[in-house]
Amino acid sequence: MNPNYLDFEQPIAELEAKIEELRLVGNDSGISLSDEIGKLEDKNRKLTESIFRDLSAWQVSQLSRHPQRPYMLDYVESLFSDFDELHGDRNFADDAAIVGGVARLDDKPVMLIGHQKGRDVKEKVRRNFGMPRPEGYRKACRLMEMAERFKMPVLTFIDTPGAYPGIDAEERGQSEAIAYNLAVMSRLRTPIVATVVGEGGSGGALAIGVCDELQMLQYSTYSVISPEGCASILWKSAEKASEAAQAMGITAERLKELGFVDTLIKEPLGGAHRNPQKMAGHIKDALGASLERLESMEMDDLLSRRYERLMSYGAPQ
């Protein structure tokens, strides 16, 4: 099994391996195999379209965690210029699971805040697998208040399995830090756009997710608990994760239907990791459109709209 492909993508992996094999044969022998390769590439595209046309909620959940999926700093590099990272909560420490700083979107100054998971083992440990501690959320809050003072819009990138549940985090006030962020963001006098780029796990995601407009990538998820966690509670077995994912309605498409999500950002065929530059372009277009809408509003109207949005969560449809 190719580790770069999920279990339901293995037919695609096998076909792409054949295409690569033909390319190598053609290069070594000097024989043109372009017609055969072209036919296989067309077959591969149709196969990929067929598989991705009707993904289950559990398969979308797997895609949202794909190890090659672009993370926040990948998008920062592709979308923004003059990024200057800011560190520390001015209280305890700097949490590398939350990255933040000032940057420019085209010529517009913005404040960026988001989760960062890490690629290799060393970085994953340093980033705590994208699970922030209280100091991470307090750093995020400090940067949001700075953005308000300097009249910069806040752009957040959500990608976390959840807030870190360790004893040390609880001792330093994890729940208080999350709750305080919710309160601050609800009244922050600057536009806020949140984009879920991977998995949006529970309060750990919501702590930087209170916003004027919420965007989700096509194969991202947003939920109160992971499918495995839900299955372990309800069925006493994580093997029921597929059923849990379907029941919870965690996908961007389902949340858009419920009115929770404002914009669903289409991903390249096969997911964001198959064409990160194209994905970045789609996100940039969506961010630009959101900021144009929000910055045309009076601030008091924007805050009233944000409050109404918060109060509508969980209301009967």
UniProtKB/Swiss-Prot annotation:
Query: Where's the CoA carboxyltransferase C-terminal domain?
Result: 39-293
Q: Where in the cell is it found?
A: Cytoplasm
Domain of life, per lineage: Bacteria
Pfam families registered for this protein in UniProt: ACCA
Using the UniProt record, give the first listed, main subcellular location: cytoplasm
Q: Which GO terms describe its biological process?
A: fatty acid biosynthetic process; malonyl-CoA biosynthetic process
Q: Which UniProt keywords apply?
A: ATP-binding, Cytoplasm, Fatty acid biosynthesis, Fatty acid metabolism, Lipid biosynthesis, Lipid metabolism, Nucleotide-binding, Transferase
| rRNA processing as UniProt keyword | no
Query: Under which EC number(s) is this enzyme classified?
Result: 2.1.3.15
Q: Name one GO molecular function term.
A: carboxyl- or carbamoyltransferase activity
Q: In which pathway does it act?
A: Lipid metabolism; malonyl-CoA biosynthesis; malonyl-CoA from acetyl-CoA: step 1/1
**InterPro entries, per the entry:** Acetyl_CoA_COase_a_su, ClpP/crotonase-like_dom_sf, COA_CT_C
Keyword check for Cell membrane:
no
In the UniProt record, which is one GO cellular component term? acetyl-CoA carboxylase complex
Q: Which reaction does it catalyse?
A: N(6)-carboxybiotinyl-L-lysyl-[protein] + acetyl-CoA = N(6)-biotinyl-L-lysyl-[protein] + malonyl-CoA
- Annotated family: Belongs to the AccA family.
- What assembly does the database describe for this protein? Acetyl-CoA carboxylase is a heterohexamer composed of biotin carboxyl carrier protein (AccB), biotin carboxylase (AccC) and two subunits each of ACCase subunit alpha (AccA) and ACCase subunit beta (AccD).
Job description of the protein: Component of the acetyl coenzyme A carboxylase (ACC) complex. First, biotin carboxylase catalyzes the carboxylation of biotin on its carrier protein (BCCP) and then the CO(2) group is transferred by the carboxyltransferase to acetyl-CoA to form malonyl-CoA.
Question: What is this protein called in UniProt?
Answer: Acetyl-coenzyme A carboxylase carboxyl transferase subunit alpha
Query: What is the native source organism of this protein?
Result: Chromohalobacter salexigens (strain ATCC BAA-138 / DSM 3043 / CIP 106854 / NCIMB 13768 / 1H11)
